[in-house]
Structures are given as structure tokens and as C-alpha cells.
Amino acid sequence: MSIPLILASKSKPRRDVLYSAGICPTIRVSHVDEPAALEAAAREEGVTVDDLSIKQRVMILAVAKAEAVHRAYRDVADTAAAATGDRVIAYPLKAKEIKDSEREAAVEDLREAAAGKPIDYSKAEIATTRDFSGIDMPTVTEPIATAIAGQPGLTEATVGPLILGCDSMFLLGGECYGKPHSEAVASERLKRMSGATGELWTGHCLIDFATGRTVRGASHAKVHFGEFTDADVERYIATGEPLEVAGSFTLEGFGGAFIDSIEGDPHGIIGLSLPLARHLAGELGITWTDLWNVGRGELEPESKASGNQHAGILPPVENVHQPGDGWVDCACGRKHWGTNGASGILLARRDPVSGKVTHVVMQHRAAWSAEGGTWGIPGGATADGESPIEGALRESYEEANITPEDIEVVGSYREDHGPWAYTTVFAFEKPGHTVEPKANDDESMEICWVPIDDVPNRKLLTAMKTDWPRFAARLDELATAQ
């Protein structure tokens, strides 16, 4: 199996550079306050930010981004490793009530759907988990520690995943340019760049999660611009492209036609130098080809919302495919999201006096997602190289701001369909800690604490509606045992 790479950036161009080179990274945004990071570094050196060279600046920010994501993954791994309680595994397809003929008919429905028109996953029944309510499912119970020891994950890895942080800045006439953010700033900069030559610097920091070893380096290239008119600048700015990129231009987009020539690595201008990244991996003793996880010419799988354009509902354009993403044709006759399975966190809050469960965190799902508009728990596909518990902790932080260092895992429930499974991870806030959930991305309309008695009154995701009675009972048992 390939060594997973985590890109500490939401930059789609950086992600695309890696993908075209055979590496599909996991995207983890660092949320680094860049001006604050530069100010802090300058204070340590006893200088001002203006005194820092462009190389120093991009390296400071690349390291800050990689280290922030490394800390976040460390929190995930530590919380997962400290999990207590039992894992219950349910096998609904082995229940007597699920007859072979029913399964065969369901699989045939799946084949017919796959051969037909594009599926609107936000509404199609085939993307809805089957309702197994009223079915006596065979179950197996084991200590959760046994499950953790037997599953590959961050805590068991001897190498990787690798965490890559990058930052780019443009140097022109002795002045450092980051992202312009506004049309006025972009216009002023672009007019200066006409017919001029500048340098694009990109800092790189690579961390091996398993060992904690860190390597770093910077790439730079000279960019020779052609001459362009004020009208060219106005029309370019109108595309929106130059507003959120270092230097106010892109090599691979609309701005590429205005670049006459380049001296140096062109990938570094896009924001990630492949030769330098390969060299850094080598310093860690890792062969670059061991990171390959995409076949040559391999197309990306369907998105979570494939077919939604027919329903007039579009997922955000910035959403990108990540390792573990994809629809699975399940033995139950439905399609499920997550090639490695999926998982989520059912986080409960207890009364500080009685210890009883009072609230749980719930997610109001975005309209474009499967069963959009319903309520469930934050979670998603398990990425390559992580266990279901680690995946649930990562996804719930990314989606709902459930900070792993503030919760304790006390059990799990795995619904196993054979080729696919979903793991619900039960957790409580740690004593003295408070989780403040919020929607961190576009997969939710709302994330909030919901009173435990109000959960059945919400329009629930099919699987949650089926499972809620037993989940509520188990939360009560777990709260009593704490």
C-alpha cells in the first residue's frame, strides 16, 4: 500500500500538481494566521517582518502550516489510542429477515441504476441506506482496544503519513507580494508586472508523522512577463483568478498566456515543486514512487453529489477528490460513500451533577449531499492510512469543529455490510472541557447541540432514524458507567 500524503493546504492547483504526478493527497487546511506567524518569527529574530527575506517568509509559513496539521493529527491519534469501552459489530445482511432473494433483487436494481442515467445522489433511493429497523441483526462485541490494535492507522504506522506544508510569495522590484485579496491591489500589482521580471518563491516543509522527522527547503524561479494593456488587466481581474493567488497571476490558468518565459521549476510557480518535494522525501528515506496512489490516466471517481446538476443543486466547485472518496456498490443493493468505509462521531454532553446525557451534536446536511436536508452526525469517508475511529475524529473536526483533544471515546458501533461498513463512534466531552460545534465547511447547513429528547423530532438520515433508539439507550448505559 502506498504511503499517504497529507497536503496542509486547500490550494486546488497544488493538489492538482500532485494528482497529475500520481499522488492523490488528503487535504487538511492548517488555519494558520499568516500575518501573526510572520510577526512572531520576526520578534524571535529581533527584527520586523519587513526585514525578513522572501525566502525566510515562505519557509516560516510552510513550517507553520505543516506543524499545525501535524499537531492536529497528533491530537486525533492520541484520542483514538486512548479510546475505552466496547466495539459492537452488527451484520444486518446476515439476519434471517434478509432473504437471499431480496439481496439478489437489490443488487439487480443497483446494476440497472448504474447502467442508466446519472444518479442524483441527494435524492436517489439507491444512495439511501436501507432501513433495517425491526430486523434482529447478529452482533459481536469486543473490547475497542482489540479493534484498534487490529486495524491499520496513525497509531500503528512505522512510516508516514507525510505532511506537506507550502507557501508561495512573489518578489518584484524588491517588494514581496502575497495574495492581493482585492481588485484594487491586484490591478496595481499587475500593471507593475507588465513587461517586467520577478521571482516566485515557494517554501516546503515535509514531516513524517510516524517518526516526527522534519525536512524543509525552498524553490524559486524567475518569471518574465509579456506586456499587457490596462484592458487586459481589467478582464483578467474580472475572472477572479488573480485575487487569491500569490503574485496575482497563475501559470496554469488565464494568466499563463501573459508569461513569456520561466527560468527554474514551473511547478514551483504553481505552488509546489515536485523535484524539491521528491528530494525532501528522499531525505526522510522515503522513495517518491512509494507515494503513488493514482494510475496513469486514471479518472477521478464520481463526487458525493454526482448527478445533482440535473436537480439544480450543485456542490461547491472547490470540492476535490481525496483518498477514500468514492461510491461503493454494496451487497445490500445500495451505493455507499467511502471506498474504505465511513465513520462519524456521536458526541454527547452530560449534566455535570447527575451525569445524564442532555445533548448530542448533530449535523444538518447540505442539500447537495446524499439525503440532503436531513439530520445526522458529522463524519465521512475513512482516508487511506487511518482507522475508522481516527477518520471519525478527523472528519468531525473538519466538518463540525469537534476538537479531539476535548473529547474521550467510550465505545463504537460498526454496521458491517461486507464490502462497506459505517462506524459510529460514541464520545463524551472530557470533564472540564467544552466543545463548541460549528460548520467548518460546506457539507453542513448547520451544526449544533441538540437536546437529547428532541432528536427523534428532527428529519433524520435514514440510518440514524433506524439506529437512534439503540444509540440513545447505549449513551445512557455509557453515561451511567462513567
Curated annotation (Swiss-Prot):
Catalytic site positions: 167 (proton acceptor)
GO molecular function: nucleoside triphosphate diphosphatase activity
Chain spans, region Maf-like: 1-299
Alphabetized UniProt keyword annotations: Cytoplasm, Hydrolase, Nucleotide metabolism
Residue ranges of every copy of the Nudix hydrolase domain listed in the record: 338-475
InterPro entries per UniProt: ITPase-like_fam, Maf-like, NUDIX_hydrolase-like_dom_sf, NUDIX_hydrolase_CS, NUDIX_hydrolase_dom
GO biological process terms on file: nucleotide metabolic process
This protein's GO CC annotations: cytoplasm
Catalytic activity: a ribonucleoside 5'-triphosphate + H2O = a ribonucleoside 5'-phosphate + diphosphate + H(+); a 2'-deoxyribonucleoside 5'-triphosphate + H2O = a 2'-deoxyribonucleoside 5'-phosphate + diphosphate + H(+)
Disulfide topology: none
Keyword set includes Phosphoprotein: no
Matching Pfam families: Maf, NUDIX
Cofactor(s) listed: a divalent metal cation
Record bears the keyword Cytoplasm: yes
Cellular compartment(s): Cytoplasm
EC numbers on record: 3.6.1.9
Homology family: In the N-terminal section; belongs to the Maf family.
General function of this protein: Nucleoside triphosphate pyrophosphatase. May have a dual role in cell division arrest and in preventing the incorporation of modified nucleotides into cellular nucleic acids.
Protein name, per record: Nucleoside triphosphate pyrophosphatase/Nudix hydrolase fusion protein
Source organism of this protein record: Bifidobacterium longum (strain NCC 2705)
